[in-house]
Amino acid sequence: MNMYATLILALALSMDAFAASICKGAALHRPHFREAIRTGLIFGLAEACTPLIGWSLGLYASQYIIEWDHWVAFTLLFILGCRMITESFKTKQEKKCESPCRHNSIVLITTAIATSLDAMAIGIGLAFLEVNIVHTAMAIGMMTMIMATLGMLIGRYIGPRLGKRAELIGGLILIAIGFNILFEHLELFMYAK
């Protein structure tokens, strides 16, 4: 795989993280630049590791993983989306009672893992090609880090304009991403038969 194909693959795989980080930035109402960098690093790390995991597993058990990865991604994104929608209806007093640091880290890491499962599936496929998996994974991770950081910064300016609706819209977008992943895999499965 040449450099251009690798960059296009990296950009395509970073789009879910970009959309999810826009939602997170909008829901946080003016996150700091440090939070945007942190989000980018977490998404980038997850997106860089999962193709390596997929590539390793592709050498051994590709058939079993491909059958379930889309269901796992859909379930995680659906649950996170529902949680964001529920959060959008909470009052400020109810939100103050929660530990925001712990809550945000758990949700952020779970979202990063859920949006990177498609990269694991790609890694499985890359196991059957002549490709330098380390360079490819680094390109995917770097592109995702950049796109997720940009997404947070874009969300920072969208959030105040949307108010409480930002979390509601973010939750709906995460659910839509989950359904998109599920339908793409089910559609491919239908054509394979």
From Swiss-Prot:
GO CC terms in record: plasma membrane
Keywords for this protein: Cell inner membrane, Cell membrane, Ion transport, Manganese, Membrane, Transmembrane, Transmembrane helix, Transport
InterPro entries (alphabetical): MFS_trans_sf (IPR036259), Mntp/YtaF (IPR003810), Put_MntP (IPR022929)
Membrane topology per record: Multi-pass membrane protein
Origin: domain of life: Bacteria
Gene Ontology molecular functions: manganese ion transmembrane transporter activity
Pfam families on file: Mntp
Membrane-spanning segments: 3-23, 41-61, 65-85, 106-126, 133-153, 169-189
SUPFAM superfamilies: MFS general substrate transporter (SSF103473)
Locations listed in the record: Cell inner membrane
PANTHER family on file: MANGANESE EFFLUX PUMP MNTP-RELATED
Task of the protein: Probably functions as a manganese efflux pump.
Record-stated family: Belongs to the MntP (TC 9.B.29) family.
Official protein name in the record: Putative manganese efflux pump MntP
Organism annotation: Photorhabdus laumondii subsp. laumondii (strain DSM 15139 / CIP 105565 / TT01) (Photorhabdus luminescens subsp. laumondii)
